[in-house]
C-alpha cells in the first residue's frame, strides 16, 4: 500500500542521509509486487531473477534476453544479471542445444557485462578450468566504469539462442559495443 511505500522511501532516504550517500541498496524484484523497475531504482541495483540449473530454468539466452529487453526501459547498469556454474546438473539438460554446458564460461560471464555481473553459484564447486575466466574479468574491470557511464541500449535481434544480438553504450563522443553470435547458421 501507499503507506508502506512512503515508509520504505523514508528509510532509504534516512540511511543515505546518515551515511553521506555511501550506501547502495540491493532491491529484489523476483516475486510479488516489489519496487525496482519503475520505483526505487534510484537507490541501488535490482536483483532481477532467480535461475537455477537444479530446476533446469537457467538458459544463457534467457538471461541475455531479459537484460536485452529490459535495457530499453531500465538502465542496464542497475540490473544484477547472474551467470551460473555450467558444470552443475548437466544431466538435467541432456540433449538440449541451449544447455549451459554448451557455452564457454567466458560467454556466460559476457552475457552479464551490460548489467552488474553476479556469480550466482557456490564458487567452491567450480572445476579448475573455471579459473580461466579471471583474465576476462580483469579486462572487463578496465572498461566497466566507462561502459556503465554511457546510455546502454540493445542492438541486433532479440536473443533467441540463434540470433546476432548485443548492446551499445553511448557516452557523448565515445562508446562501446558488445556483440553476441548465438548458435545460428551464419556463425562461421
What are these regions (language model features)?
Residues 3-125:
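Glycan-recognition surfaces
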Residues 7-8, 21, 101-102, 147, ...:
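Short amphipathic alpha-helical surface micro-motifs
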Residues 112-156:
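Aromatic- and carboxylate-lined catalytic core of secreted/periplasmic carbohydrate-active enzymes
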Residues 44, 150, 164-166:
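Glycine-centered structural positions embedded in regular secondary structure
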Residues 158-188:
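Carbohydrate-binding surface patches
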Amino acid at each position: 500500500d501507499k503507506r508502506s511505500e512512503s515508509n520504505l522511501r523514508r528509510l532509504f532516504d534516512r540511511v543515505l542521509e546518515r551515511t553521506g550517500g555511501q550506501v547502495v541498496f540491493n532491491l529484489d524484484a523476483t516475486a510479488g509486487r516489489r519496487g525496482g523497475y519503475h520505483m526505487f531504482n534510484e537507490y541501488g541495483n535490482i536483483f532481477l531473477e532467480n535461475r537455477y540449473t537444479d530446476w533446469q530454468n537457467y538458459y544463457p539466452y534467457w538471461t541475455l534476453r531479459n537484460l536485452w529487453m529490459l535495457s530499453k526501459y531500465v538502465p542496464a547498469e542497475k540490473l544484477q544479471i547472474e551467470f551460473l556454474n555450467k558444470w552443475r546438473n548437466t544431466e538435467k539438460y541432456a540433449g538440449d542445444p541451449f544447455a549451459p554446458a554448451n557455452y564457454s564460461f567466458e560467454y556466460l560471464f559476457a552475457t552479464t557485462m551490460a548489467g552488474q555481473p553476479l556469480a550466482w553459484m557456490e564458487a567452491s564447486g567450480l572445476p579448475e578450468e573455471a579459473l580461466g575466466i579471471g583474465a576476462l574479468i580483469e579486462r572487463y574491470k578496465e572498461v566497466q566504469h566507462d561502459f556503465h557511464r554511457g546510455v546502454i541500449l540493445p542492438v541486433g535481434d532479440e536473443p533467441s539462442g540463434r540470433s546476432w544480438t548485443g548492446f551499445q553504450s553511448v557516452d557523448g563522443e565515445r562508446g562501446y559495443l558488445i556483440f553476441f553470435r548465438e548458435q545460428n547458421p551464419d556463425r562461421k
